[in-house]
């Protein structure tokens, strides 16, 4: 089974029902994959839900089918080594995926692979 890390922007696209939300939902419906998010993504979506007064029911429903991966000291050190003044969050997400045995990352960010310096497969929605 393929383990896929979902970048925060994919879940935000769904929660806010933005233009790519249907494509994101379709991509996340493959039963042959295990979907996961980083602890950082959980923080980001929870913060955005509070800020924009979104329903927490939707988040809780999402969390019931997603693994939540830890950000450890090893994750932070790996991300720090790769950071080149572009996007530390991308580096942290990629390092989290790599240290937790994910095979791919699903994102909306066209520059994710370039900024994160990951060797994992990166699937860009849209």
Question: Which positions does each model-derived feature cover?
Answer:
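Short, flexible helix/strand-to-coil boundary loops that buttress conserved ligand/catalytic motifs
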Residues: 15-16, 49, 83, 116-119
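Acidic catalytic patch
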Residues: 62-84
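A generic structural signal for short hydrophobic patches within well-formed alpha-helices
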Residues: 11-12, 42, 76, 112-113
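Short, well-structured N-terminal submotif of metal-dependent ribonuclease cores
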Residues: 1-37, 49-57
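Short beta-strand scaffold positions
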Residues: 6, 36-37, 70, 88-91, ...
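Acidic, PIN/NYN-like endoribonuclease modules and their adjacent C-terminal/linker elements
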Residues: 3, 95, 99-126
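A general structural signal for well-ordered alpha-helical segments in protein cores
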Residues: 21, 38, 42, 56-59, ...
């Amino acid at each position: 089974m393929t383990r896929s890390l979902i970048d925060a922007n994919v879940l935000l696209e769904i929660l806010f029902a933005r233009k790519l939300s249907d494509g994101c939902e379709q991509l996340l419906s493959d039963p042959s994959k295990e979907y996961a998010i980083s602890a950082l993504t959980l923080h980001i979506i929870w913060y955005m839900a509070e800020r924009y007064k979104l329903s927490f029911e939707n988040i809780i429903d999402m969390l019931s089918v997603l693994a939540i991966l830890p950000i450890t000291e090893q994750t932070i050190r790996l991300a720090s080594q790769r950071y080149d003044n572009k996007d530390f969050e991308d580096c942290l997400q990629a390092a989290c995926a790599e240290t937790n045995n994910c095979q791919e990352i699903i994102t909306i960010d066209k520059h994710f692979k370039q900024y994160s310096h990951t060797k994992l497969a990166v699937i860009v929605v849209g």
